[in-house]
């Protein structure tokens, strides 16, 4: 249910990740923050004035006088804080046991343990950020690549809100005209220029909404990434390629076919995309029981992958087993990779054979995983196949997420329905006003104006404790 934080309880949580580190931070937010700090903090300087946004050195001390830790603290006075409430941060040594002891003392003095995302939830309900910025905080925390961080930071800076607000303003203006026309029906045609409304709907609503929808899949790729499987017969160099892309000896490489018997997965940044790259067991008909299990797992991974690198050995002629493997994976998005460029047969038999049964529409590249040749071209090909673009997208165009998609699609449907009604001479002010309000409600749902409580619960539950 909706919550007003005007006189809500003071909350606290550990804001830094679990584990050992140099510094660990406990965050407190609410009207009792400073009072709680004053009861547990012994400043090094007895004349501590607790000026806002200034750090103080001292000790956290339990009621019995026992020192829990030597700390730095900062008090931040509302409203110029993350939550628009009084906030205290206690910077302790980064041992989780120390942090837990201090947090328990803070709770003992009157704070409640914060729920996941509750600090950001308060920032939203107290008007500091809109809902798109709250979601961007999640994306900043979970981004897997630098490009993903840039996309999230762009949204955190308000890029999505800035693109939606002009659309809403145009709709508000048009709807206001309709409302006046409804009140004065005999003058409606003098009040509303329906040709102008048609033009505005097309240029100020439909066109920008379509642009926003185009960014949903882009944003998904940068946020969630893709899965990519390296598939091929035994000993074609799949593990060597994994090691080359990761620039580390992650997979065991030998000249013995069937060395890899289980899948090896790692995350890699390819032109800003998080790519979960999977090295699989070489697929062949004759295999022992353990290897056969690895082969079946490889087939399962191929079926669930977003992209398959179909690898062949360029130092030998291809045979029926290569063709059979290709036929098994032909339904997947694919790049054909001819490995062992350094040993490539002089007559080009591997490349020529690939041309025989791989469609021309499938990108193909010759590389040497061992020597690192052709890897940059392969990365570019991977990016192009996945995105349909040769260059990375700008961050602003990647802001919308899957939650926004539903609202944008509903907005588009309502706006296009209005255009159709106007074209057929069926658009009355009262009916058009209803569709206008539908558009406003859907766009308001994105930025948090008309969002339902259950949606809030889902969004903020994705946060970690302390944020």
UniProtKB/Swiss-Prot annotation:
Which coarse location class describes where this protein primarily resides?
Answer: cytoplasm
Species assigned in the record: Desulfotalea psychrophila (strain LSv54 / DSM 12343)
The similarity annotation says: Belongs to the TRAFAC class TrmE-Era-EngA-EngB-Septin-like GTPase superfamily. TrmE GTPase family.
Q: Which GO terms describe its cellular component?
A: cytosol
Q: Which Gene3D superfamilies match?
A: P-loop containing nucleotide triphosphate hydrolases (3.40.50.300), Probable tRNA modification gtpase trme, domain 1 (3.30.1360.120), tRNA modification GTPase MnmE domain 2 (1.20.120.430)
Coiled coil (residue ranges): none
Quote the protein name from its UniProt record.
tRNA modification GTPase MnmE
What is annotated about its quaternary structure and interactions?
Homodimer. Heterotetramer of two MnmE and two MnmG subunits.
């Amino acid at each position: 249910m909706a919550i007003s934080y005007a006189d809500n309880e003071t909350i606290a949580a550990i804001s830094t990740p679990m584990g050992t580190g140099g510094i660990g931070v406990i965050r407190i937010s609410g009207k009792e923050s400073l009072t709680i700090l004053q009861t547990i903090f012994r400043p090094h300087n007895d004349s501590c004035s607790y000026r806002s946004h200034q750090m103080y050195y001292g000790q956290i001390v339990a009621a019995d006088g026992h020192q829990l830790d030597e700390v730095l603290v900062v008090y931040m006075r509302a409203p110029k804080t993350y939550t628009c409430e009084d906030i205290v941060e206690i910077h302790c040594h980064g041992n989780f046991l120390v942090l837990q002891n201090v947090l328990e003392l803070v709770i003992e003095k009157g704070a409640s343990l914060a729920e996941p995302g509750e600090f950001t939830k308060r920032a939203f309900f107290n008007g500091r950020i809109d809902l798109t910025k709250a979601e961007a905080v999640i994306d900043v925390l979970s981004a897997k690549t630098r490009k993903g961080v840039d996309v999230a930071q762009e949204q955190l800076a308000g890029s999505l809100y800035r693109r939606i607000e002009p659309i809403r303003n145009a709709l508000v203006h048009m709807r206001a005209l309709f409302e006046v026309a409804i009140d004065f029906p005999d003058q409606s045609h003098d009040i509303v220029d329906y040709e102008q409304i048609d033009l505005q709907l097309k240029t100020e609503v439909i066109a920008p909404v379509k642009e926003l929808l185009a960014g949903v899949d882009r944003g998904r790729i940068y946020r969630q990434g893709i899965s990519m499987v390296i598939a091929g017969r035994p000993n074609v160099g799949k593990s060597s390629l994994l090691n080359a892309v990761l620039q580390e000896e992650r997979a065991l490489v030998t000249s013995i076919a069937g060395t890899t018997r289980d899948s090896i997965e790692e995350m890699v940044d390819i032109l800003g995309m998080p790519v979960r790259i999977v090295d699989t067991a070489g697929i062949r008909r004759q295999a022992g029981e353990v290897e056969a299990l690895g082969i079946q797992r490889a087939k399962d991974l191929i079926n669930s992958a977003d992209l398959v690198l179909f690898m062949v050995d360029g130092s030998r002629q291809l045979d029926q087993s290569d063709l059979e493997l290709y036929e098994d994976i032909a339904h997947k998005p694919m790049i054909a990779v001819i490995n062992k460029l350094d040993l490539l047969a002089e007559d080009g038999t591997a490349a020529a054979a690939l041309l025989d049964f791989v469609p021309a529409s499938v990108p193909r590249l010759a590389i040497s995983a061992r020597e690192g040749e052709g890897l940059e071209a392969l990365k570019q090909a991977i990016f192009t196949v996945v995105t349909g673009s040769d260059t990375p997208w700008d961050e602003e165009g990647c802001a919308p997420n899957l939650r926004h998609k539903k609202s944008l699609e509903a907005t588009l449907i309502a706006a296009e329905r209005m255009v159709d009604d106007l074209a057929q001479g069926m658009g009355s002010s009262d009916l058009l006003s209803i569709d206008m309000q539908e558009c406003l409600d859907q766009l308001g749902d994105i930025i948090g104006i008309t969002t339902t409580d259950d949606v809030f619960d889902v969004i903020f539950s994705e946060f970690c404790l302390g944020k």
